[in-house]
UniProtKB/Swiss-Prot annotation:
Pfam families reported for this sequence: Rhodanese (PF00581)
Domain of life: Bacteria
InterPro entries according to UniProt: Rhodanese-like_dom (IPR001763), Rhodanese-like_dom_sf (IPR036873)
Protein name: Uncharacterized protein BUsg_049
Organism: Buchnera aphidicola subsp. Schizaphis graminum (strain Sg)
Sequence ranges assigned to domain Rhodanese in this UniProt record: 50-140
Amino acid sequence: MQDALFFISNNLVLSLIWLFFLILIFFLSTKNMFLKSKIINNFHAINLINQKKAIIVDTRSVELYDSGHIINAINIPFNNICRKTIKKLSLSRSVPIILIIDSLEYNKYIKKFTKYGLDKVYFLKNGMNSWNSENLPTTFKKNIFLK
């Protein structure tokens, strides 16, 4: 024990760098456990859609949505997410929701949904870029929800 304290006192900068990286590794490895949502890949999203009848909510702009979106995705831009919208969609706590977000600030989107009592909120990693890169099916149909 004295050797460890002796080493730390003689190599304070090295010890602080080591401690910083240890905390960083711990934070990054446990981050997903404390999120109220999960970051999922395309494979997991397809499983949720097919097996659990997940609802896909595309939070991108109307222009991006109209340029191509996942089949049966509902376009709800960030500013339109409210309790009234959630009720109109008839979303329940038991139905998984997959968010398509083209922003690095996905936490604010997820907080909006969890704020209204929806627990099973998922975030598609890399959004439509990932979906399109794997040549998964998309459509150009207009959004019927907001009409």
